């Protein structure tokens, strides 16, 4: 929300214009609550993973099949990301990909097999760094010039669906070995384990 193609800036004047627009709000949404975040644009492939488990039991954390979000090759590098208008098909300020044909913004594929271990390990590290419990989706970018990976987000409230038109989890199910029901079962099991652990801790305190 609030993220558009014009947010990729190349000079101070462009930055000031974007900041001024954000402070004006968008459809009643206040984007300045809590401050604004500016970060380097990472040009390169984008990956996403889904994780279940708890940070305090890192050996039991499960990372499901990572997927690469491969953006339409008609787009220039600085447009290969999920802008709000294109993600939600609003097109108030931006044009759809392919204009008349409304081509897909991206497709999901398995990442290069040589990258999967690093993607999974970075996902676990990021999840534990924010004290993740239950589940989360991790978005990662790799700088195509250096090969270095960056965590874009750890989303603790990501959509849960096996429809990949709605969420990347559907693509993980299609490309991986796990069923969607397995993922939901792992989330429920972790929630029950966490609840039991807290109940035991409360019992010990009250003794």
Model-derived features with residue positions:
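A conserved helix-loop-beta module that forms one wall/lid of the active-site cleft
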Residues: 1-8
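Flexible, active-site-adjacent loop/turn segments at secondary-structure boundaries
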Residues: 40, 79-82, 86, 104-107, ...
């Amino acid at each position: 929300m609030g993220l558009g193609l014009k947010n990729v800036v190349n000079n101070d004047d462009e930055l000031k214009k974007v900041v001024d627009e954000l402070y004006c709000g968008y459809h009643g949404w206040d984007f300045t609550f809590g401050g604004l975040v500016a970060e380097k644009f990472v040009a390169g492939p984008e990956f996403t993973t889904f994780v279940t488990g708890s940070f305090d039991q890192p050996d039991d954390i499960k990372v499901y099949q990572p997927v690469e979000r491969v953006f339409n090759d008609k787009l220039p590098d600085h447009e290969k990301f999920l802008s709000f208008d294109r993600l939600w098909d609003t097109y108030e300020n931006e044009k759809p990909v392919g204009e008349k044909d409304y081509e897909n913004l991206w497709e999901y594929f398995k990442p290069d097999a040589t990258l999967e271990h690093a993607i999974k390990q970075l996902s676990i590290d990021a999840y534990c760094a924010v004290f993740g419990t239950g589940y989360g989706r991790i978005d990662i970018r790799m700088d195509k010039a250096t090969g270095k990976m960056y965590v874009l987000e750890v989303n603790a409230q990501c959509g849960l669906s096996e429809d990949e038109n709605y969420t990347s989890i559907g693509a993980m199910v299609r490309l991986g070995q796990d069923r969607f029901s397995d993922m939901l079962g792992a989330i429920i099991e972790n929630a029950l384990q966490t609840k039991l652990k807290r109940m035991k801790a409360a019992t010990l305190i009250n003794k």
